[in-house]
Amino acid sequence: YAQLLCELRKKKGMTIEEARKLVLNPLYLGCLIIKNGDADGQLAGARNTTGDVLRPALQIIKTTPGITCVSGAMLLLTHAPEYGKNGILVMGDVAVTPVPDAEQLAQIAVCTARTAKSVVGMEPKVAMLSFSTKGSAKHEVVDKVIEAVRIAHEMAPDLALDGELQADAALVPEVGASKAPGSPIAGNANVLIVPSLEVGNISYKLVQRLGHADAVGPILQGIARPVNDLSRGCSIEDIYRMIAITA
């Protein structure tokens, strides 16, 4: 595995001696085992930061073809069956990219939709969230979401996606019909894309704590093979749930 790492990083000037030291790090070794085809995925992070987990994954496994932005999705298992898929919502990005540009936000939307379909089995209905609904407010951050919607439609023409939508317009049929008449997503969204990491992290934790929802994740997206990151405050239940998702 040291030889493989040396080959992968030779353009960066890595020597075999440096590679031999790095493979003693389980995070590097795990990614090398995956890269070599000897394992299918990795779950880490109970004792490491997200940066520690992502660094070897991006250096060794790299991103999914066509994707340059790594992100994290959170499954929100709420007690409100009228929302999402029997109360299940998927939110992104909640873990990785602090201030995505329009291109990155579009990639986050497409990747989160794929996660919703592959992990939850839901047909994704993606709402690009904002403090504006269909031009109700004017601001450069709203313009970014509008541009991300356009790019996402180009990336995935068959994906059910719309924006910009406020959260209530995305989730509540009556509000959606009033604020965004004719929208295929308003009032029926099950995948929520937030405009920044700050919004995502705050939002899911408010839903988790005040709404007593179970938050499962983050599920890392955009890496070519399954690599997932645990919170350092994770429970045994968190670990086995993420093992199942990674598998």
Regions found by a protein language model. Give the residues of each.
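Anion-binding alpha/beta catalytic cores of soluble intermediary-metabolism enzymes, centered on
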Residues: 1-186, 191-247
